[in-house]
Structure formats: structure tokens, C-alpha cells
Amino acid sequence: MSEVFLELGQRPDEAGPPINGPAAYPDDVTDRLTADAQHITARYPDARSALLPLLHLVQSEDGCLTPAGIRFCAERLDLTDAEVTAVATFYSMYRRTPTGDYLVGVCTNTLCAIMGGDAILDALQEHLDIHAGQTTADGRVTLEHIECNAACDYAPVVMVNWEFFDNQTPSSARDLVDGLRSGNPPDPTRGAPLCTFRETARTLAGLTDPHVRGGAPGAATLAGLRQAQELGMSADPDGASA
């Protein structure tokens, strides 16, 4: 039996500075975003419930959050800039610095680490000549380390704009980012084809996504369900197995 040793230490520094950038949008951008925002807020009985999708909307405009985006959300939802900023800086999916066309996240949590996640992160940092939290000079790839991609059954996992690339190795991860930088992005293991970070942010805002295709879980995810079905297992309303 082979032994696995884990060394826990400080992760590379990642972007987390104050939100910077333009303080206001040009009129044409404001008009366009306002039309989208009206479509989004109409889904909610209380407009402020639309804050998260509106933050994705302004992120789709700038590639990150800016004072202009914060102000836009605050004005549309009758909130203060401070209230919007408090929410925006709580969630890691809202970026505080300009993000490349492809946000490449490497999981380094326990299972992915055991299966090689740390080696993948180290390989990509060397291959791209950047640290986690930085962007390549061509603006194509931003690298980050992630504590969990919620895909432990396919560890080690790399995500690109939150689409899954399962069972990765240092070699396959290098090939992946090379494809992204050359303009030939590979298809994810499952889910929708890749689009740019800004296009993904627009999708997360709840606007039409022309890329969506079957999103069923993979075989490994459903292994427990299949076994339960084969054994005739079920659950009663009180939660006790039968």
C-alpha cells in the first residue's frame, strides 16, 4: 500500500484588493445595462433580491467589479454603495481585479490534493509563469486555487469559467491552458461548451444562454443512486430507509 503525505501551508497570495476602476458608465452602457437589469429585477417581488444576478451583470461588462458597477446596482435596488460592496466582497465569484478570458480554478482541497491537485497547481504556475490570483500577459488566463469545486467524485478537478474538467493531471492541465491561450478551448468533461468569463457572467446573471446543453450528473456522481436502485432501497417520508 502506498503512503500519501499532505503538507498544509499558506496558499499563494490571491487578488483581494479594494474595488477599483471607473466610477461611472457612459450613457450608452448605462442604457444597455438598465434594460437587462429591468428584465432581471422583474423576476423578484422585492427588487433587492436581484442583487446577486445584478452583480454578475455588471461583472459581465467590466470583467470584474468596479465602482461604476457597484453604483449601478445600488441605484437600481435602492441600496447604498456600502451595502452592495459588503455583499460583493463576501462571495469569491465576484472578482475585484480584471480577469482574463478564462478563469482557471484548481481545487486543492483534501481529496483533490491527495489525487494530485497541488501538483497541478504548481505545474500551471510554472507553465504560465504566474502565481494563483494573477493573469497571463496576453489576458487569456487567470489562475486561482479553489478550496472545493464540489466535484470530489472526479478528483482532481480543474474548472474553467466554472465548467468541469475532470480527472486532470499536470500534463492534461498544461494542454488545457495551452488550448485556451491558442484560441482552441477544449470541451469540458460535462456541461456547456466554454465561453469567455464575461459571457459566463452574463449567463449567471440569468440572461439567455445559447450554450446550454444537457447538464445531467456524470456516472460517478450517480453510482450510489444506481446501487440503491439495484438493491431495491427507498426512503419513507420520515427519512428511514426501507
Predicted regions and their residues:
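Signature of N-terminal electron-transfer/Fe-S-associated modules in redox systems
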Residues: 2-242
